[in-house]
Amino acid sequence: VCSSDLAEKVRTMVADEKMIRGLLKQNQKTPSLRFGATLTIGEFLLPQRLNTYLQEHSQTSLTMIVENTATLLQMLNSGDIGFAFVEGYFPKQTYDWQLLSQERYIAVKGKDYNLQKEVHCLKDLVQETLIVREEGSGTREILERGMQEINLSISSFERIIEIGNVQAIKTLVRNNQGITFLYEAAAREEIEKGELEVIDLYDFHILHEFNYITLKDSVFKQQYDAFFASVQRP
């Protein structure tokens, strides 16, 4: 067994032990699941998909922690949550993971927002006010990586506003305070209502994975996988 495999096994054992101790301390008669989700998934994707699981497991208690990818990975590693749904990048070789969905990542503006110039590519937007999530957020990391590929960065923009909440960002964009980049799933309702508009860019096309992750070889894996199978169905 190589040292990295051994380290992963030890980490899983320690995390499982913490989870078991927590369950014993609660002394619950009903089963419980404690998991995490990043903001876009937790607010806009999972709520619509939880119905089936809740109906089939009416005795199960659920706790969903909504945090950014970096924080969820720390919580998973330490046994504070059993599994996570993340939109950010993570070391795939370190975890057991499965694809939840693929989502389009888009630029949007308010319907009455006047762009500084005619826009065709990402560089045409740098004179705008950019409203983004905080560092450590999966949503922001996707944007940073996409920009790097065309030699741009968040600091290329004229003005930057950082907000740690998707709803607040959408409100500011609806009120024409700037533009933002987010997952289509997070803005679908506002786009359909005509409150937000997609900014078409010929050089910026991102389709990104939302993934379900657990520690390798967890004793709870079968229970976690059953939950995933249920929410995998739209």
Task: Identify the meaning behind each predicted range.
Residues 30-92:
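Central regulatory/effector-binding core of bacterial HTH transcription factors
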Residues 68-73, 77-80, 87, 152-198:
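Hydrophobic hinge/microswitch elements
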Residues 6-27, 227:
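Alpha-helical linker/hinge and terminal dimerization helices associated
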Residues 95-131, 135:
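Flexible hinge/capping segments at coil-to-helix
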Residues 45, 197-234:
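A late-sequence structural motif
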Residues 129-151, 220-221:
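Secondary-structure junction motif
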Residues 96-106, 158, 192-206:
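Short beta-strand->loop
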Residues 1-3:
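Short, small-residue-biased leader/transition segments that mark boundaries at the very start
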